[in-house]
Amino acid sequence: MLELAGDAQNLLCGGVARAVKRDYPNEGSGWVEGVYGFRAMVEDEVRALEDGSPLSMTGRVFAEESQPLDGDANTIARATYRCGTFVIADLPACDWRVRATFGGARREERVELVVNDLPRIRMTLRPDTSKTVEFVVPLDRRRLELCVVPVEMPGDSSRVLRAELQELSVERVSRQRAARPRIFVAADSTSQTYFDYERPQSGWGEWLYWFLYSDHAAKVDHDITSDAKQSRVFIGNGPTIFNRGLGGRSLKSYRDEGRLDSLLSQVCPGDICLIQFGCNETSTNRPMRYIPLDEYRSWVEDYVDSVCDRDAVPCLITESPLYVEAGRTRPHGVFDDYAQVAIEVARERGVAMIDVRALMDQYLLAMPGQARDAIYMRLEPMQYACHPTGLKDPIHLTTFGAKTVAGMVARGLAASFNGIQVYDEPVVERLDAPAQFCALIDRIVSGAAVALSWQADPRAQYYVIEKRNAQTKRVYARYVSLKPEFLDRMLPGQNRDIEYALTAWADTVSSAEALATVTLPSSDSPCIDMD
């Protein structure tokens, strides 16, 4: 519920705000050494707004779009440049009710009122008539920047709006504390909720409830306050969780697309806001996502400000590390540099920090090597319809990986905030050998495969399958499976008599082997016995 929290401030007097002129007269550098250069802004201060007199405003808008690199649409640089008069006021990053009156239009014109780069109001200005509008702006930084421009017409960048700002006042809006604890997640693909057809890919945001709800059960609905189809709200015996994580987003694109604005419009005092970015910002060939390292700190600080100024509580979270094969030391990379910025901001600002990056490094060192292939999207061919040829993804998480990170986040929350309780699963001390393990020949388009299946163990996190020569025990391959089935394609050079050894795993605990053998008929495969 919104409430007014004080007297309205007139931004046209008292020196609270200032007027500036902005333009983008020169073309950007474009692609230079793998980084796209946009047009540079030229800004001249007009005056401080002292006496309350009307402000003459001009406005013009034009858009530009680059060509894609190598046909990749994600490399397209798009920019909307708004030129003319801007009113700028330094204000707390909270919710403000804005009242603005415009007049002095020279002709009837359809215009857009823009605040902090996001269009807020469309209206028609007419000669000899004043137009007053009121609206609420959830500021996502400690600054309000307002301009008015013509509604953009394709191919027409020459139209210049001339109008008069006769009144501009703001009044702080407060929100009541929510009836029950709430957690908002602003993050990227490693947190996002995924659909069933995208499995086994998963995000930790969709598993957080598992560790925060006493019965590990949640009612899951689409978050109707978000326009992203992946957004979900989790309701159960614990804090309500709004997972607004979305793939391919950085601090920049999350804000530019209005997603931070949408989230902040729902945040109330006392809410916890989890903020995890630092991956897509490093993509120099993705201009809409990229944030140079030397600019990243100010973006993180803006997010922290926008939560703190609402009397809500931010918690910064580092990204999980990239996949590295067992036995190798993970080299220092650019992701670490961005993570370090978030760690420093958290320390300097005194806000909570969950260093998933460090926690995951420690966890992986303690786990058997094959756990890495179960945590990351390292999929063998023919196992999942969404990835028929397999996948070797060093960033994104499986259901097991996402659940593992969710546990780290939940325990970090409990250590940082009163009233948060973690309901961890019992430690598995023993696993039985998988039951009903069988191997059957399965004909496929280009030959034959062996279909393996077994009874699922709810305590197991993943399974390891070792394929070997039934006579000599020579190991041909070792696979990891997240589900109680596996389709194995014959390998050149393997014997036709195959033995499969299956073990179930939970952390460092493994079961005894379950064995299954199969003999492939000679007419089914071009395999040559090399043993």
Question: What does each model-found stretch correspond to?
Answer:
Residues 1-194:
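Compositionally biased, intrinsically disordered or flexible polar/acidic segments
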Residues 13, 173-244, 261-272:
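Serine-esterase "nucleophile elbow" of acetyl-processing enzymes
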Residues 103, 149-151, 491, 503-507:
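Beta-strand-rich extracellular modules
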Residues 105, 456-459, 494:
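Short glycine/proline-centered coil/turn motifs in the loop regions
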Residues 112-114, 462-466:
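Beta-strand signatures of extracellular beta-sandwich domains
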Residues 256-403, 407-414:
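Alpha-helical cap/lid subdomain in secreted, periplasmic
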Residues 429-459, 507-531:
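Pro/Thr/Ser/Gly-rich low-complexity, intrinsically disordered linker/stalk tracts
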Residues 464-497, 507-515:
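Recognizes extended acidic, P/S/T-rich segments that occur
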